[in-house]
């Protein structure tokens, strides 16, 4: 398989799909269809094995194992050239994940070589705590602590105004959704979610087709909520206001609803 995937763990999204949701992606990972440092591809294909499945199998059989390390960094393709220049614009910032079971719960240590405080940290926290929750579901255990080590944590001058001008949210609604599912159900669910996401970005997609897409009775509510947000955003980008509102009205996650309101306000500002 090619490295065209810009993955979010069990779901793997092609470069074109990711750019639909983030039109500025090429500014950070370079132009072209291939995305060199795609995390999901690295975790599931790059090294010749599915690291997530191997981790699940190892921890299922030997819960006390301290040898499970998920690798995203590949020295052969990620080390700088001899003159110190980057080998590619999209070098993985996250280098390894270390899941381990302690006292019957799944702990997670994430190690990051370089971490943008504004545009990196929030996304990494969401990405890898989600993966921790998904893996815990596969293993049939609860989540324990999540710890993140950033070797080079930095803030760019261009982002200072946004960071220092921000204020903590008050009375934030908790996210009560759980992504934890048994492995087989999880793989089927993410496969269907991936199929729907790929369909959402097709240029010929009609409004009524997108409206049917967010009706997913077979899925758990947490995944229906996730899909509702994606459908709402796909509708917003196409100017289908009624569908955008209708999709979010089906979302039962109060945290998602609050964040959606803030997102729309930001986009309209």
Predicted regions and their residues:
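Terminal, non-catalytic protein-protein interaction segments that mediate quaternary/complex assembly
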Residues: 1-269
